[in-house]
């Protein structure tokens, strides 16, 4: 069970060939095939755990500015095998970084105990997946203005702190 009485460190494993944060260190793609490097994933995860991570977060769709959406099957192929490997190797809270209900469902079945959603469970079916999960997962609701492909074009706030606070307050009320 996730305890938030003190700060918790989350290690991020981006299983994407176009990640903005790790330069696609853990995954490669050519025109016909996507693959992740199992040894690199396990090495990086072990390093994060040694460094104090209490959660390992696995993402298969980049949300960097300008990123294109990833088909559901591709996101599943990127994330579920990694979650299964991590579950077999580590006794740690696993998180799925997704906004896609089908990926949430498969990830929870594969051992994830936290849903980390940059779209704050706004996609159709997302709230229901979390609500109906056999073991109630923790949820991390995040804020994103617009969509990755266009977020830099429509970026505008009158009061960023007030608007993000209000958005998250409403999302919490709606998902409770």
Language-model features: where?
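Glycine-rich, proline-tolerant flexible connector loops at the mouths of alpha/beta enzymes
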Residues: 19-26, 54-81
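Glycine-rich anion/phosphate-binding loops
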Residues: 21-47, 74-77, 120, 124, ...
């Amino acid at each position: 069970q996730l305890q938030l009485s003190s700060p918790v460190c989350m290690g991020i494993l981006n299983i994407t060939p176009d990640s903005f944060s790790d330069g696609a260190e853990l995954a490669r793609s050519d025109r016909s095939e996507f693959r992740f490097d199992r040894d690199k994933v396990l090495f990086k995860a072990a390093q994060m755990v040694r460094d104090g991570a209490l959660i390992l977060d696995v993402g298969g769709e980049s949300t960097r500015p300008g990123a294109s959406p990833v088909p559901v099957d591709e996101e599943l192929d990127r994330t579920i095998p990694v979650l299964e490997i991590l579950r077999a190797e580590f006794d740690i809270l696993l998180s799925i970084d997704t906004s896609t209900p089908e990926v949430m469902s498969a990830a929870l079945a594969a051992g994830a105990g936290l849903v980390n959603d940059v779209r704050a469970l706004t996609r159709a079916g997302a709230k229901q997946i979390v609500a109906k999960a056999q073991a109630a997962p923790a949820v991390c609701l995040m804020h994103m203005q617009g969509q990755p492909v266009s977020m830099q074009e429509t970026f505008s706030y009158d009061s960023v702190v007030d608007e993000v606070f209000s958005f998250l307050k409403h999302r919490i009320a709606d998902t409770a």
